[in-house]
Amino acid sequence: MEKYIVFVLSYILGSIPFSLVITKIKGINLREVGSGNIGATNVARTGSKCIAALALLLDSLKGFIAVYIAKQFFDDGSFHMYASAILVVLGHMFPVWLKFSGGKGVATTLGILIALNISLVLAFVFVWLAVFFAFRYSSLASLTSTIAAVLSSFFFQRDLFFTLLTVAILIFFKHYRNIVNLLQGRERKFS
């Protein structure tokens, strides 16, 4: 029974739309800014780096907390612990409160990586920063850093590989429009 409670809690925790809440407090309707997405990247487009940093922190924190809670109930490397990691990302991407229209899961994935393996965090963050500063596309940085985390897991924590591969497929699915825009040269750069 407790595994189901942890699974539901992971999804619910992931579905808390922190970015939407904190921008609404500032009088901004995030759904009407930039891409309309509720992730930290779109919060950055509101012009407030502090609010964007807070959104990134909170979205990452929910991924970390979900895995931390799962670790209290399940063995490291267990199916149930990894299922909780996937469910928190699914909650962020498809929150029931927002008609299943949420963020893209990158910050939440960072949080689960922090809870699971610091080596993967280093690969993820290094690649994200390198690609972002080289090309100024947040979406490209997110996609390549996700691939880097999956590939790194194969070498540093193989039991995590299929979990991260699943999360990567979800992230690529949520970035579909960004991928099309990148291929067509229409993706918005950060200046």
From Swiss-Prot:
InterPro entries: G3P_acylTferase_PlsY. It is found in: Cell membrane. Pathway: Lipid metabolism; phospholipid metabolism. Keywords: Cell membrane, Lipid biosynthesis, Lipid metabolism, Membrane, Phospholipid biosynthesis, Phospholipid metabolism, Transferase, Transmembrane, Transmembrane helix. GO terms for biological process: phospholipid biosynthetic process. It comes from Wolbachia sp. subsp. Brugia malayi (strain TRS). The keyword Zinc-finger does not apply. Catalyzes the transfer of an acyl group from acyl-phosphate (acyl-PO(4)) to glycerol-3-phosphate (G3P) to form lysophosphatidic acid (LPA). This enzyme utilizes acyl-phosphate as fatty acyl donor, but not acyl-CoA or acyl-ACP. One of its GO terms (molecular function) is acyl-phosphate glycerol-3-phosphate acyltransferase activity. Its EC number is 2.3.1.275. Belongs to the PlsY family. It is a multi-pass membrane protein. This is Glycerol-3-phosphate acyltransferase. The gene is plsY.
